[in-house]
Amino acid sequence: MVVSEKSKILIIGGTGYIGKYLVETSAKSGHPTFALIRESTLKNPEKSKLIDTFKSYGVTLLFGDISNQESLLKAIKQVDVVISTVGGQQFTDQVNIIKAIKEAGNIKRFLPSEFGFDVDHARAIEPAASLFALKVRIRRMIEAEGIPYTYVICNWFADFFLPNLGQLEAKTPPRDKVVIFGDGNPKAIYVKEEDIATYTIEAVDDPRTLNKTLHMRPPANILSFNEIVSLWEDKIGKTLEKLYLSEEDILQIVQEGPLPLRTNLAICHSVFVNGDSANFEVQPPTGVEATELYPKVKYTTVDEFYNKFV
């Protein structure tokens, strides 16, 4: 029996929030791993330290830029799979990646910068709606160009939302009172960043995820806001005072608050008021679910996540 070689993976945006987990997991999983890095990134002390870590994993650094077509094309010609984890300000620049993939003609799979909620199902308000629309546009362009793809839907980053339980500017879970978005009943989904990377790298060579949307829905992590608060209360042996932020309150803040806050709250409205994270079924043949495809992966549960905060 011939063991097929693991694909060569290029990660664009590898020094970003979720990108660094993907670079590490890809390299440690035995994939020849490449990271497209801007030369200016080396001048950032924090990013420079991260790049040294990448080198220790055996990652090949390719200097270039998503807006420089020549460097992009040169990088893409060296690999089999391209994963983009660029931030919101660069979503539209992924058009350049699509053009380069089309010109190179060697890419077996493209994973665009999704790594959030399913934008084809979400009913977001502005300013999140425009952000989601950019992702939708990139999806339709990939499909129109006939580029093989996988869209990765991981829902909430656990380390982003859970440490402060969605309490603005807090660093740890609340001990006295908690603000709950909406009535706290719609379910949402939380996945640890390391697990997101594991499921994603598992999927890159899997024919079952080709031209599919990969949904991450760990059963133990599909919880309502009220259920998470209750879980936390059980851990600390204390009942918290609960303040419910109504839909009207959220909409008012979204209209009047500063932009970063408005965007985050607009996403919270989609997830915690509309229930857009978990209010639909994963529909085959276009949708597949990660924990069903990869049952051997042991994911971190929300319950386990909070043990370190007790």
Swiss-Prot record:
Other facts noted in the record for this chain: Root cells silencing A622 exhibit inhibition of cell growth, severely decreased formation of several alkaloids, and accumulation of nicotinic acid beta-N-glucoside and N-methylpyrrolinium cation.
One biological process term in Gene Ontology: alkaloid metabolic process
Signal peptide: none
Family listed: Belongs to the NmrA-type oxidoreductase family. Isoflavone reductase subfamily.
Induction context: Induced by methyl jasmonate in roots. Down-regulated by auxin. Accumulates upon the removal of flower heads and young leaves.
Top-rank taxon: Eukaryota
Protein name in UniProt: Isoflavone reductase homolog A622
